Amino acid sequence: MPLPWCFPFKQGKSKIAKTCSLPLDEETGLKLLYEGPTPKIDIIAVHGLNGHRENSWTAANGVNWLHDLLPGDMPNIRVLSWGYSLTTAANSHETLSQQKVSEQLVCDLWEMRSSTNTINRPIVFIAHSLGGPMVKSALLYADSAQGTPTVDLRSIRLSTRGAIFMGTPELDSRLIGLQSYLATAQGSEQESSDIYKEAHWLVTTLQSYPSISQQFWTLFVHERPDSLSASSALDQTASSSTQENSSHIFIQADHGGMIKFESSLDESYLKIKEHLVHVGKMLK
């Protein structure tokens, strides 16, 4: 029988309903993929734009490595995948604020961990593509949250021990054009457009994140399809290479395929697993 907290929470009953007020549907929110006998770590997966909390991590042969592979190598973990959408179910043309969506992640995590008495359990995030800025924005929000006797959202940031960012946008040469656009559009009518607001949120999040990133271990995973040159691949590490307590690896796959592994023998999966096991040992 499914546990009630595996599904989107009913806002009317939530202790933090006023903070977490985004519309939810059956495909968004947290979903439990695995829970070991004595979990020591919460692994939280966050997909990219227009992704799915299960399908995005599932290979063509039906293997979802978060559910089917990782528990075999790390049995004492709890794995949850978080789904989100930037449009509402009622109106596909209504765009939700990326900031508000990232705040929802914090609220969902706190609600689930509170209801299962696991508020202080260590967290490791695994984020793909836009999921990276979502997680970074969520952690910045949690870090600045003011706690109350019943709700302490800051515990989400304080419990975070690691993050794996897979194919996520960083402040490197690929975002120079976006930064130029913001500088040009500032003070004009474009400043009120959704495009400007989204770009401003992304750049601001990436610029602010280093202020908290040194508090935990980070692995940056970069895609390297056959068509990508070595120089282009190295450029992907430029912005984050100086971050303390971080490592970089490359995966021979395209953007969508880099988070799908068909078996426990997959070379890319072995790289990810090695780093997760390392974090697990550090937390013992």
What kind of feature is each model-predicted range?
Residues 47, 89, 99-212:
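Serine-dependent carboxylesterase/thioesterase catalytic core
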Residues 1-13:
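PEST-like, low-complexity acidic/proline-rich intrinsically disordered segments
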Residues 55-61, 92-96, 137-141, 175-181, ...:
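Short coil/turn segments at secondary-structure boundaries
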Residues 72-88:
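Conserved alpha/beta-hydrolase
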Residues 43, 50-51, 78, 90, ...:
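C-terminal catalytic-base region of ester-bond hydrolases, centering on the histidine
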Residues 24-76:
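Short, surface-exposed "cap/lid" segments of acyl-processing enzymes
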Residues 82-86, 168, 223:
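Active-site loop/turn elements of alpha/beta-hydrolase fold enzymes
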Residues 50-55, 87-91, 130-135, 163, ...:
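Eukaryotic short linear interaction motifs
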